[in-house]
């Protein structure tokens, strides 16, 4: 059979009070989940598999239908995130409008968290939970043979089917094939704060052992690929002249030893790459940052979230302000760039002064860049459950949206102490307080190496400041 994997466009993403520039950044990343899936299926089955990144190309539904029909797809598999349900449903309809299509399958985070709601969407033939490689291959084999695909692990076909457990293909991440990035137009992907050359994302692990209340990742046990497997993938990227790498693990430094081993392998292979990683501040020490810099690390993204120990404790971050300041001071001393992520409108911010305290702390911390967003609790997180228990949040709006996705839906904020409009005004103030400082502008100008850097940084800054 001919399977076309589609990443839907991002024209109607749920408004989550994250600046659109930050949301848009992730839409310019390659669809790693689909690349991994397609590479595995092409290696293990006889079916023909291709990828359509409708997000990268910003395709209208009619254009999606034409592309599906032109490729003569029998089955369309759609990557599904809850915040993109409007575009997911429109992509389902676009697929059904193609004469060649017999089945439409949904998979991805939304199907893991809300399988029954996903299966109930009109036009959907089946839903896959967990890692889709083996379930999707079994589905294709069954449909090709004309068999009813009932009882397949990880697959929900009929609306009366029991909800299957999510499938985990293997805990050995080294057994996964290196994603074939040539299945998409890999030269077109960019990062908001990238280094300017060809860019891609790499995942080296699954899950996170930490317990932040606003995140649903803690439900997944941490497993990491070996340094050798990671560097094999980096070598494959370099072979395509991709040298700007963003490690998008939930937490890159789960242990310092693992980071040291990865860096040692990069250095031993003399890989000429620059890279960014997402890390926690606790455990960061001089030896670690020095090793990371020697291995090509240009920038570290830290989730700081709050400017007080009380705020960090409420979110169960498991870090302290002292650890935050030590990590940023060390990076500054050793010449490694930093990005700090902050939330405003959290349960411990009960008045304007509390929010201003977070904003002022972000300025005083002096990262190279900062990303602010308004706290938006999502169903499935402990913070959302706490909001339900306290009467701050309601599940019904999300349930209605999942049944009937509409573009005017807006995710709930923690509005116990502020209105949405008040929080948006404070968000604007936060960005202006940081990025409109003369010291920040002059510092960025001093770091320019070529004219293209000026254009890239100016574009990023304008999007952060004005695209709201």
Spans of features found by a protein language model:
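Catalytic cores of alpha/beta
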Residues: 115-120, 288, 349-364
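Residue-level detector of structured alpha->beta connecting loops
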Residues: 72, 123, 296, 335-337, ...
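Short acidic/polar active-site loop segments enriched in Thr and Asp
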Residues: 47, 74, 243-245, 298, ...
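A structural motif corresponding to the C-terminal end of an alpha-helix
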Residues: 37-50, 99, 240, 269, ...
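Radical SAM [4Fe-4S] cluster-binding motif and immediate context
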Residues: 174, 178-348, 360
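Acidic, low-complexity intrinsically disordered segments
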Residues: 1-239
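Radical SAM enzyme core and accessory elements
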Residues: 2-5, 12, 46-48, 65, ...
């Amino acid at each position: 059979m001919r399977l076309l994997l589609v990443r839907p466009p991002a024209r109607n993403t749920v408004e989550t009070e994250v600046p659109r520039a930050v949301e848009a950044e992730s839409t310019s990343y390659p669809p790693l989940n689909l690349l991994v899936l397609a590479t595995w299926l092409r290696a293990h089955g006889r079916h023909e598999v291709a990828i359509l990144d409708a997000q990268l190309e910003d395709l209208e539904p009619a254009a999606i239908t034409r592309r599906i029909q032109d490729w003569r797809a029998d089955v369309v598999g759609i990557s599904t995130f809850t915040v993109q349900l409007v575009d997911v449903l429109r992509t389902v309809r676009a697929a059904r409008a193609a004469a060649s299509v017999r089945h439409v399958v949904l998979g991805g985070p939304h199907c893991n968290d809300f399988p029954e709601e996903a299966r109930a969407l009109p036009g959907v033939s089946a839903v896959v939970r967990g890692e889709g490689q083996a379930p999707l291959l079994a589905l294709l084999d069954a449909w090709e043979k004309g068999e009813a695909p009932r009882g397949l692990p990880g697959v929900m076909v009929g609306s009366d089917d029991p909800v299957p457990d999510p499938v985990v293909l293997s805990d050995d991440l080294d057994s996964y094939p290196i994603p074939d990035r040539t299945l998409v137009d890999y030269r077109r992907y960019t990062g908001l704060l990238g280094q300017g050359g060809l860019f891609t994302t790499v995942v080296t692990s699954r899950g996170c052992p930490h317990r932040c209340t606003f995140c649903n990742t803690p439900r997944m046990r941490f497993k990491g690929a070996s340094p050798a497997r990671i560097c094999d993938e980096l070598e494959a990227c370099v072979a395509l002249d991709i040298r700007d790498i963003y490690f998008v693990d939930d937490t890159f430094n789960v242990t310092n030893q693992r980071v040291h081993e990865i860096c040692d392998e990069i250095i031993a292979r003399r890989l000429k790459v620059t890279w960014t990683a997402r890390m926690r501040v606790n455990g960061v020490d001089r030896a670690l940052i020095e090793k990371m810099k020697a291995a090509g690390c240009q920038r570290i993204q830290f989730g700081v979230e709050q400017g007080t120990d009380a705020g960090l404790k409420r979110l169960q971050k498991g870090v302290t302000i002292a650890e935050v300041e030590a990590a940023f001071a060390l990076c500054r001393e050793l010449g490694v760039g930093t990005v700090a992520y902050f939330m405003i409108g959290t349960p411990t911010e009960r008045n304007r002064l509390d929010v201003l305290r977070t904003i002022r702390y972000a300025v005083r911390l002096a990262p190279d860049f900062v990303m602010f967003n308004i706290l938006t609790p999502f169903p499935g997180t402990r913070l959302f459950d706490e909001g339900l228990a306290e009467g701050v949040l309601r599940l019904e709006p999300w349930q209605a949206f999942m049944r009937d996705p509409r573009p005017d839906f807006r995710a709930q904020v923690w509005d116990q102490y502020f209105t949405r409009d008040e929080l948006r005004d404070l968000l604007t103030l936060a960005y202006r307080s940081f990025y409109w400082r003369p010291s920040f502008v002059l510092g960025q100008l001093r770091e320019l190496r070529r004219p293209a850097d000026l254009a890239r940084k100016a574009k990023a800054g304008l999007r952060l400041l004005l695209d709201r």
